[in-house]
């Protein structure tokens, strides 16, 4: 099946991302990319797919951008020439190299004698986030007047 190319030009990055999201949800298309144009903060959204899907996605994106007063231009090229489609779509093999395999290192068990030291058990929990005093009865979220050190702020 022949791929078609859809272009939607909107003003602003946030609107471009929102339009791309709406178009991807509306039809079975592939988002080729978002490209910043020169001046005025315009962005071009490039999509590919079969003709009906691209037309449906572009019409959805046009109505979405028009409601938000950000539509600049739109175009669906049903049967683009070989040079246009190959020039606007970069192959994935060039853009994303295959990840290098990671070596598998066997996990050795650490004897209990050499285990990492645990936190001391006698450490008291700090409940007041104002004075950080473990003896303070105030809990986080309670009024500041319940803090033991409520009148002593700013003193060293």
Swiss-Prot record:
Pfam families: BMC. Residues 106-116 have a biased composition (Basic and acidic residues). Gene3D superfamilies: 3.30.70.1710. Residues 81-119 are annotated as: Disordered. Signal peptide: none annotated. It is found in: Bacterial microcompartment. The keyword Iron applies. GO terms for biological process: propanediol catabolic process. SMART domains: BMC. GO terms for cellular component: bacterial microcompartment. Pathway: Polyol metabolism; 1,2-propanediol degradation. PANTHER family: BACTERIAL MICROCOMPARTMENT SHELL PROTEIN PDUJ, PROPANEDIOL UTILIZATION PROTEIN PDUA. A minor shell protein of the bacterial microcompartment (BMC) dedicated to 1,2-propanediol (1,2-PD) degradation. Belongs to the bacterial microcompartments protein family. This is Bacterial microcompartment shell protein PduK.
